[in-house]
């Protein structure tokens, strides 16, 4: 079931363009980070202040049907806006990895589980390791698990 509400495209033009191209092609185009060859997925959330639907491309870090959503923001000192969407609405999230989106629930990781998924994320996208050295915050990692039908 798709999230209900008004869709508010990203203020970032490249994000808007990538989401539109990915969705319109069923994930066959715009499915890598800006021609890097590194696969992405799109996740959909609700904004906690506006209630509007937001869509965000992130690196595809998948293992056994679960996905890590890494809130790196390039190693900036603050979290990306979408971090707050996931914190506010962890059960109101969709993920698209291919032609059809599916409902997921997310939870923020800690401890050994965080370390395990962080290593997986760095293996997929090595710049994450550099991002970690650029910030004093622990870069949040959420685990997205498909909801049972």
What is each residue range found by the language model?
Residues 63-65, 100, 149:
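Short strand-connecting beta-turns/loops that link adjacent beta-strands
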Residues 43, 142-146:
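Short beta-strand element of the conserved SAM-dependent methyltransferase core
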Residues 37-72:
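Short beta-strand segments
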Residues 1-34:
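Extreme N-terminal tail/first-helix region
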Residues 40, 138-141:
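Short hydrophobic/aromatic beta-strand or adjacent loop that forms the aromatic wall/cage
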Residues 4-6, 73-128, 134-138, 146:
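Short, structured beta-strand-loop surface elements
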Residues 29-31, 50, 128-132:
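Short helix-to-loop capping/linker segments positioned immediately adjacent to catalytic or ligand/cofactor-binding
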Residues 33-37, 132-136:
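Short coil/turn segments at secondary-structure boundaries
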């Amino acid at each position: 079931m798709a999230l209900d509400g008004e869709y508010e495209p990203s203020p970032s033009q490249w994000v808007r363009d990538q989401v539109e191209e990915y969705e319109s092609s069923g994930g066959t185009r715009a499915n890598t980070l800006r021609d890097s060859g590194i696969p992405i997925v799109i996740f959909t959330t609700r904004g906690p202040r506006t209630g509007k639907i937001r869509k965000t491309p992130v690196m595809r870090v998948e293992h056994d049907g679960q996905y890590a959503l890494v809130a790196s923001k390039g190693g900036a000192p603050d979290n990306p806006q979408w971090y707050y969407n996931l914190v506010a609405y962890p059960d109101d999230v969709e993920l698209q990895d291919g032609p059809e989106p599916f409902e997921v629930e997310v939870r923020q990781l800690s401890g050994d589980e965080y370390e395990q998924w962080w290593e997986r994320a760095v293996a997929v996208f090595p710049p994450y390791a550099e991002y970690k050295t650029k910030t004093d915050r622990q870069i949040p990692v959420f685990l997205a698990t498909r909801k049972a039908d």
